[in-house]
Each structure stands twice: as structure tokens, then as C-alpha cells.
Amino acid sequence: MRDQFISLALILCVLHSACGLYFHISETERKCFIEEVPDETTVIVNYKVELYDPRSNGFMPSSPGIGMHVEVRDSDDKIVLSRVYSSQGRISFTSHTPGEHVICMFSNSTAWFSGAQLRVHLDIQVGEHAIDYAHVAQKEKLTELQLRIRQLLDQVEQITKEQNYQRYREERFRHTSESTNSRVLWWSLAQTVVLVCMGFWQMRHLKSFFEAKKLV
């Protein structure tokens, strides 16, 4: 019971986490992030690009002419999304296979801005945190109680997806372990057979040598 409670708490921590950060890149640099995503889960990527201004020794709040090429690949290395966006945007996609999704970003560099330093603000939201409940309440005309029930149902659904994903990972790990153990066993048997054959051959060779020398 205690282990189940700890597992549930960890899942809730994962569900309530969002990746908010910023990083610096040059225009020729490619930056990638890995996000563990269950299947049929919505992922929202919010980003904003700022250009370094050497005159003010800071970053411009807007970067006209600079866009970001965003590419998303799923756990099977298939492209989920790949296109050029503006310097600030909101990207949404839904996972169809569970596992690691790689989100890569790089600028659509031009000769004018070539070699410039960029600051990229990035916020990745997964699952029910990617849902704008204020918009949902307004669109579907939900009361506060109905909206809260909707949020709880979405949280339960996301917890179920996370649990299914953990079972999927455990199954893959078990399959990998069994496959590795099987290969180790067959390799050990092969080594044993080779050693027995070499020992038998050496005994035959020594016997022939002693007979030739008339020592036996």
C-alpha cells in the first residue's frame, strides 16, 4: 500500500511539472530536448526567440526576420512535426506512440543575422497541463464545479496513461533483460563446448605424440 502511494505521488509530481527554461544558441546551432510522453497525449511547446544586441549588451525582446525551425521525432524516429515558425509561437502535437520524443530547434539563419547569438525561452507542457481550461470553460459554458470535475477526469485519464506507459517500459526492460540473459547463456554454452573440444583435441594430440616417441 505504501509503495502504491509513493508511485501515485511520483506520477502526480510528473503530471504537475512543466519544463520552463531559456538557453543561448548561435544561429548555426541545433538544440534538442527529450521528453518522455505516453501515447495519445497532448504536448504544448511555447517558445520566444530574442536576438543579442551588442550596442545595449542585452537581448532584443523581438527579433524580426528570425524564425525557428522546430522538428519533433517520436520513439520510432519518425517525424511528427517539422516546419519553420516565427520568432515567437505556440506549437501543439499529440503523441501516437509512447516513449521518448525528441524536440529539436534551430534558427532559419539568414546572411543578415549570420553568426548572431540567440536566447530562446522554452516551456514544454505535457498532458492535462497542456489544456487551456479557461478557454474550455468559456467554449463549453461550464460552471466552476463542472470545470473542476472535468479537470479531475483529465487528471485521472493522464494518470492511467502514465501507469500504462510505466507498464510498457517495464515490459520492454523485461524483454531486454530476458534477451540479454539468453544470449549470455548461449555464449557460455558455446565457450564450454569450444573448451571441451580443445581439451579433447589436445589429449588426442598428446597421445599421438607419446606413441610416436614410444613413450606409451
UniProtKB/Swiss-Prot annotation:
Cystine crosslinks: none
Entries under InterPro entries matching the protein: Emp24-like (IPR015720), GOLD_dom (IPR009038)
Gene name tied to this protein: eca
One MF annotation (Gene Ontology) recorded for this entry: cargo receptor activity
Cellular location(s): Endoplasmic reticulum membrane
Disruption phenotype: Mutant embryos exhibit reduced dpp signaling during early embryogenesis. Maternal tkv is not active and is not secreted.
Motif (Prevents secretion from ER): 213-216
Membrane topology: Single-pass type I membrane protein
SMART domains: EMP24_GP25L
Record-level GO cellular component terms: COPII-coated ER to Golgi transport vesicle; endomembrane system; endoplasmic reticulum; endoplasmic reticulum membrane; endoplasmic reticulum-Golgi intermediate compartment; Golgi apparatus; membrane
Name the UniProt record assigns to this protein: Transmembrane emp24 domain-containing protein eca
Reported function: Eca and bai are essential, though not redundant, for dorsoventral patterning of the embryo. Specifically required during early embryogenesis for the activity of maternal tkv, while the zygotic tkv is not affected. Involved in Golgi organization.
